[in-house]
Curated annotation (Swiss-Prot):
Catalytic activities: L-seryl-[protein] + ATP = 3-O-(5'-adenylyl)-L-seryl-[protein] + diphosphate; L-threonyl-[protein] + ATP = 3-O-(5'-adenylyl)-L-threonyl-[protein] + diphosphate; L-tyrosyl-[protein] + ATP = O-(5'-adenylyl)-L-tyrosyl-[protein] + diphosphate; L-histidyl-[protein] + UTP = N(tele)-(5'-uridylyl)-L-histidyl-[protein] + diphosphate
Organism phylogeny: Bacteria, Pseudomonadati, Pseudomonadota, Gammaproteobacteria, Pseudomonadales
Protein name according to UniProt: Protein nucleotidyltransferase YdiU
Record key words, sorted: ATP-binding, Magnesium, Manganese, Metal-binding, Nucleotide-binding, Nucleotidyltransferase, Transferase
Family (UniProt): Belongs to the SELO family.
Enzyme class: transferase
Alphabetical list of InterPro entries matching this protein: SelO
């Protein structure tokens, strides 16, 4: 085991030079204290699960102390925001502190969010608030537990530093981990500023360190883009299958690695609503739940445009054309498993789509439906779920088709139950649960956020005494729309 003050650094991105990032020191927050830490994220750096030295966490991630090998830098990038190109974005409040190598030889970026102003702050104060930091922490650890690729969160540090958003709040920092923080927007920045040498340098860097297997291809950059398409097709399929709505799918929020990145006003669906908008700033619904698939394809096309100096257009188009069929195959496989079906059949797509149509407008809890479906035999489970649907005759027709499908596959109920419970979570990160934890933390009580994080780290297992985390939201907590303000 390593200790927190003795990490091994190898700052590869910093060595790219000043065209890619600017050296900036963290601006300390006042009276830093540890709010919550993730044992699973600590393990990625070979650190012990217990956080016995909370003062050291607070010093390092509150901006008061740096490792001697750290090289904090603010990265420059651009991006399309709500469909419009913004030529200069960059890390406006976050710093890449450096890259740590664990005992397995893996590199992990240490990125401190809320570290103060940078050259890219665009009139902002460079701070993050406790509210948004807790939300990002919880999601960063909840999604991987569900099998959804994501950046990770090591810890949240609170403070007494005041910041003003819609109201006065307290500043916080979040330490984010990821194998890379390179975004689609990095490539767009060098493309639109016509810095094609730097564009190629960035592509070579990403190829060498994150897509090394593509080096053997006849055209490595084309092979790399194809893998980016493949990874994003699987990622979005997992979002859709588990009812995750990102909320701000700007190209600067898209990771080149195909992982969930830059959490803002996200939400997991409570009642199923294909048109759910979780971001109250998204008046047109560009990033609604149902739009995430076409928007991901649009974003990949924006990345493809930025790669045209390196890859032939026909090759880029061919890879883009793979996105939808790859997405559909991944999504159908995930939904088949959620329904307890192990063998593909011709009518599976229709079975899934019919279920979603029956759910729409019926106030059916998306996550609990699948969990309850596996609790008992299909006949009993379907009978108990029937009352949740508005058009019960239509549901009965779907239920009969599903029952026949299960019967065709055969197998015993206990095996079916175990199989379904392994992929259908009992605990999901509902917005109202996060809000309750945030409100307690804002009063200095971190018990709830730590407990919620602990529960969400094992979403498929029944945890005695934690029944309250399985409940549907109260009236005040239904269909919460979250602000981008953070």
């Amino acid at each position: 085991m390593k200790s927190l003050d003795d990490l091994d650094f190898d700052n590869r991105f910093a060595r790219l030079g000043g065209a890619f990032s600017t050296e900036v020191l963290p601006d300390p927050i006042a009276e830093p204290r540890l709010v919550v830490a993730s044992p699973a994220a600590l393990a990625l750096l070979d650190l012990p699960a217990e956080t016995s030295d909370e003062a050291l966490f607070a010093e390092l991630f509150g901006g008061h102390k740096l490792w001697s090998e750290a090289e904090p830098r603010a990265m420059v990038y651009s991006g399309h925001q709500f469909g419009s190109y913004n030529p200069r974005l960059g890390d406006g409040r976050g710093l890449l502190l450096g890259e740590v190598i664990n005992q397995a030889g893996e590199h992990w970026d240490l990125h401190l969010k809320g570290a103060g102003q940078t050259p890219y702050s665009r009139m902002g104060d460079g701070r993050a608030v406790l509210r948004s930091s807790i939300r990002e922490f919880l999601a960063s650890e909840a999604l991987p537990a569900l099998g959804i690729p994501s950046s990770r969160a090591l810890c949240v540090i609170g403070s007494s530093t005041p910041v003003w958003r819609e109201k006065k709040e307290s500043a916080a920092t979040l330490l984010r981990l990821a194998p890379s923080h390179v975004r689609f927007g990095h490539f767009e920045y060098f493309y639109y500023t016509r810095q094609h040498d730097q564009l190629k340098q960035l592509a070579a860097f990403v190829l060498e360190h994150h897509f090394a297997d593509c080096n053997a291809a006849e055209r490595p950059y084309a092979a790399m883009f194809r893998q980016v398409v493949e990874r994003n097709a699987e990622l979005i399929a997992r979002w859709q299958a588990y009812g995750f709505c990102h909320g701000v799918m700007n190209t600067d929020n898209m990771s080149i690695l195909g992982i969930t990145f830059d959490y803002g006003p996200y939400a997991f669906l409570d009642d199923f609503d294909a048109n759910h908008i979780c971001n109250h700033s998204d008046d047109a619904g560009r990033y609604s739940f149902s739009n995430q698939v076409p928007i991901a394809h649009w974003n990949l096309a924006a990345l493809a445009q930025a790669l045209t100096p390196l890859v032939e257009v026909d090759e880029l188009r061919a890879s883009l054309d793979l996105f939808l069929p790859l997405y559909q195959a991944h999504y159908l496989d995930l939904m088949r498993r959620r329904l307890g079906l192990g063998v593909a059949a011709e009518n599976d797509h229709a079975l899934v789509q019919e279920l979603l149509q029956r759910m729409q407008g019926s106030a059916v809890d998306y996550s609990l439906f699948f969990r309850r479906l596996g609790e008992e035999t299909p006949e009993r489970a379907l009978a108990s779920l029937r009352d949740d649907f508005v058009d019960r005759e239509a549901f009965d027709r779907w239920a009969e088709a599903y029952r026949r499908r299960v019967e065709e596959e055969g197998g015993d109920q206990e095996s079916r139950r175990r199989r379904m419970h392994a992929v259908n979570p009992l605990y999901v990160l509902r917005n109202y649960l996060a809000q309750q934890a945030i409100e307690a933390a804002e009063q200095g009580d971190y018990t709830e956020v730590r407990l919620l994080h602990q529960v969400l780290s094992r979403p498929f297992e029944e945890q005695p005494g934690m029944e309250r985390f399985t409940r549907r939201p109260p009236d005040w907590g239904r269909h919460l729309e979250i602000s981008c303000s953070s």
